[in-house]
Amino acid sequence: MLDRTVAPPVQPLARVVLPAAEVVILPNAARLHTLPNDAQPVVRLQVVLPAGKIAEPKPSLALLTARMMLEGTAARTARQIADEVAFYGASLDCESGPDRALLTLHCLTRHLPTLLPLVYEVLTQPTFPAEELAQLKTRTVQNVQVERRRTSYRATERFNQNLFGPAHPYGQLFDEAAFLALTRADALAFHQAAYPLSQAEVFLCGDVAGYQQLVADTFGNGPAGAPVLRGLMPHPTDFQPGADHVAVPGSLQASLRIGRPWPAPQHPDTHRLNLLTKILGGYFGSRLMRNIREDKGLTYGIFASATNREQATALIIGTDVNGDSAPLAVAEVQHELRRLQNELIPAEELEIVKNYSLGKFANDLSTVFEQCDKYRNIVLMQLPADYYTQFVQQTEATDAATLQRLAQEYLSPEAMQVVVEG
């Protein structure tokens, strides 16, 4: 009989190879990436365009444009679009991030031919109707006003502004007046400039059932437009570490954001740094969780992670604590940073974190959608094809001395920006 009081032995992770995508360059220069998997009769279609915040000529125009894409086309109202998507049990949404805009369709495979014309119409013929535009602007401003009542939201805003600078798109704060001043003409012009299908990266995965050619015909027509101007904005060189405490009268909570510029994913030590970050604050048994949550009882949770954008990467440590406990929490974070610099990580702890990192990675590849997410990251971040194979190899091979060296180079408390809001 199985003895459930004894944990099963940990097995080493075998070599990981992502499924190879079929890549086709379409007549208009767009690229179609296909990852077939017929385990379930479902499909996901994603169209990625260079229409993120980094490309906008006016603040928050990328956000406004993406959120208006489903609000009406030349042939359909927003209600008609929503009804058609719901009728087929599908989902369709469009979002804008720091670097790109992403339109995503999930549907049953048999409905893909029916829904493709709708997706094409949404991408190429949005009309940005005035009534829906006004309502969206009002809703968005109200939502931001609600979010800004939270110290955690304001701390993140201020941290990004201090890290990247107020003039850099990654560091710009949401400006309510500027957002309300955006017009339908602004959205139409940005759509014309930043949403050409010739610049699209199209990702099709799931039970594609021979529909690749139909997708290629849908998104491959039209002229090969000029590349979207996305002026390279290197990481600000005037970053200044230090402390920035913003008092919030009447607030019982304080939100902490601590971090610094961080090596990009293309850096040769990126996977070792990922392991170091995991040990610091990347899982429930991390150093920060054990100290600040379990031992000191200052918070329900604390994290450390690297945030990758196409033109800059940052390390961020974040938590919410009682206002009176903020100085102690900052001091304990700095204490844990110095411990990693001054002490070798015990072999047992290092082995636990390696197993956690590799196990979580394997679990994150359990569906074709998740596999496609990893592949898409390689494409958009221009990473080597064996990036995730390197992750497994370097994670397994990294020793405590290497992590201590990296901590001494990158985790000095004096090199951090400390933001306390509350």
Locations of the language-model features?
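Charge-rich, well-structured scaffold segments of protease-associated domains
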Residues: 1-6, 80-229, 294-422
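His/Glu-rich zincin catalytic helix
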Residues: 1-83, 188-291, 330, 334, ...
